[in-house]
């Protein structure tokens, strides 16, 4: 049974254990890593995904992982700088209105700034992917809507935990330039989500997440279907959003491709409550994917239906933009 939490809770008790477990529509889980009592390290992962019908930009700032996919012409360019950030020194909280993260080396200059209204992202990357120079200058504006917030302790030792926020409530304006190709981002047609994760775990996990952030029949649609981390009986990451309203889903059955990234993935739950197929884009017979350190992002489309008893009719996914993130952490 999924447990919805509506009031604010500290993530850690006085003894460092995580006793609350569940999910929420707002960021009610108050996190302070200094209250943790685990012997292992705390990991921090922030990811942005910006997309319209022409281009998608993936940006992860745990290590610097950047991928730009051309959705009309086909093809993806990507690069990675293995440089872990300490977010306690460069805090970008989901609800904050200040804070800045800066990184500079011989090839890359990256700036991420919190603003009262959202985020400002700027990047100059020389010889991006060993092919072309990359430049982007993007303003993310926060819009109204709910977010998915999940806290999952680990059963055998509740001092270990997994805390997630999936925030699909930004629109983007600005430009992305890769070599001589320039993509314009307009707030009316370009969506962005923010994926925020904090955790301390006793072992490594192979993690997968299917996400979408597009328009269906003029309404914004966002999706998050993810594999299990920790004890998520009371709260998992599985959900979708229509025009900012969160619809929670329970366990999802996934039939993957056995490592063949160009093959379809199948996602099912309940009595056809979830029945969707993810089909990767292919270029010259290969999946359109970015390979960055221990993370792979596959770009593709969704087909199928989502059904709920409180919906007048099924939500039909037909050639809807989507992507799968595969990573080890």
Positions of predicted regions on the chain:
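Structured soluble/peripheral alpha/beta segments that form catalytic or ligand/cofactor-binding pockets
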Residues: 1-329
């Amino acid at each position: 049974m999924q447990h919805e939490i509506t009031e604010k809770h500290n993530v850690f008790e006085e003894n460092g254990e995580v006793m609350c477990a569940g999910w929420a529509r707002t960021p009610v889980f108050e996190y302070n890593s200094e209250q943790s009592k685990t012997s292992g390290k705390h990991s921090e992962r922030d990811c942005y995904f910006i997309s319209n019908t022409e281009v998608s930009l993936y940006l992860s700032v745990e290590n610097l992982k950047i991928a730009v996919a051309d959705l009309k012409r086909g093809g993806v360019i990507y690069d990675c700088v293995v440089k872990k950030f300490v977010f306690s020194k460069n805090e970008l909280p989901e609800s904050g209105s200040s804070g800045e993260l800066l990184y500079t080396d011989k090839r890359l200059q990256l700036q991420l700034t919190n603003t009262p209204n959202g985020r400002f992202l700027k990047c100059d990357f020389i010889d991006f992917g060993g092919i072309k120079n990359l430049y982007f200058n993007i303003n993310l504006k926060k819009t109204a809507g709910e977010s998915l917030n999940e806290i999952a302790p680990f059963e055998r030792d509740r001092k270990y935990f997994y805390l997630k926020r999936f925030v699909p409530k930004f629109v983007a304006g600005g430009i992305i330039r890769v070599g001589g190709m320039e993509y314009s981002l307009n707030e009316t047609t370009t969506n962005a989500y923010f994926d925020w994760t904090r955790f301390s775990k006793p072992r490594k996990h192979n993690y997968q997440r299917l996400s979408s952030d597009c328009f269906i029949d003029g309404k914004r649609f966002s999706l998050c279907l993810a594999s299990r981390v920790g004890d998520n009986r009371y709260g998992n990451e599985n959900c979708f959003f229509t025009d900012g309203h969160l619809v929670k889903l329970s366990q999802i059955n996934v039939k993957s491709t056995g490592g063949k990234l160009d093959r379809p993935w199948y996602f099912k739950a309940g009595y056809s409550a979830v029945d969707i197929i993810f089909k990767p884009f292919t270029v010259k017979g290969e999946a359109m994917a970015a390979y960055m350190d221990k993370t792979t992002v596959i770009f593709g489309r969704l087909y199928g239906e989502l059904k709920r008893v409180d919906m007048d009719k099924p939500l039909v996914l037909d050639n809807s933009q989507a992507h799968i993130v595969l990573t080890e952490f």
